[in-house]
């Protein structure tokens, strides 16, 4: 079966938001729990939804902590977000070759749009599915299924690319092929444990992988 659709996670995959996310968590947690959290403590929080993360810390303060996080994240977005090499060129080439391309993210739409505009990727994507569009987040298959439905694509024709186990397992649950990115903050070995079909050392590795898959 030929691959004609590529779905991407956003944070840590297409754009480097690691410092923004870590700083947003530290700001929020130090506001409510001064001097209790360090950088290494918040690394496991990258990937799950904000609601899932904060509800494990204090269910009574979930909504206000989410508000605090998002306000800081919004205010410091452009100064802390960076690009990854070859991402722009690769997505542009996929679009040029006729692939359907979409984003499946656990982020809110407002900050998704900020990141896409900042990185100039906003012109390429046919579909963007955010946490605002679904009831269940990755690794539940719903977000990927919604993106595939909107793109009129079948799971077996699609590849999911991401930096977190939620992306890889989400792709597996939805029936797509999966590609993990080695630049994940959690380390290459962390993602290899979830057995993605492919491992990318840079985003442009996607192009020969897809070419080979569609040739066989």
Curated annotation (Swiss-Prot):
Keywords: Hydrolase, Magnesium. GO terms for cellular component: cytosol. CDD domains: HAD_PPase. It catalyses: diphosphate + H2O = 2 phosphate + H(+). Its cofactor is Mg(2+). It comes from the Bacteria. InterPro entries: HAD-like_hydrolase_sf, HAD-like_sf, HAD-SF_hydro_IA, HAD-SF_hydro_IIIA, HAD_2, HAD_sf, PGP-like_dom2, Pyrophosphatase_Ppax. GO terms for molecular function: inorganic diphosphate phosphatase activity; magnesium ion binding; phosphoglycolate phosphatase activity. Its EC number is 3.6.1.1. The active site is at residue 9. One of its GO terms (biological process) is DNA repair. Belongs to the HAD-like hydrolase superfamily. PpaX family. HAMAP family: Pyrophosphat_PpaX. NCBIfam families: HAD-SF-IA-v1 (TIGR01549), HAD-SF-IA-v3 (TIGR01509), HAD-SF-IIIA (TIGR01662), PRK13288.1 (NF009804). Hydrolyzes pyrophosphate formed during P-Ser-HPr dephosphorylation by HPrK/P. Might play a role in controlling the intracellular pyrophosphate pool. This is Pyrophosphatase PpaX.
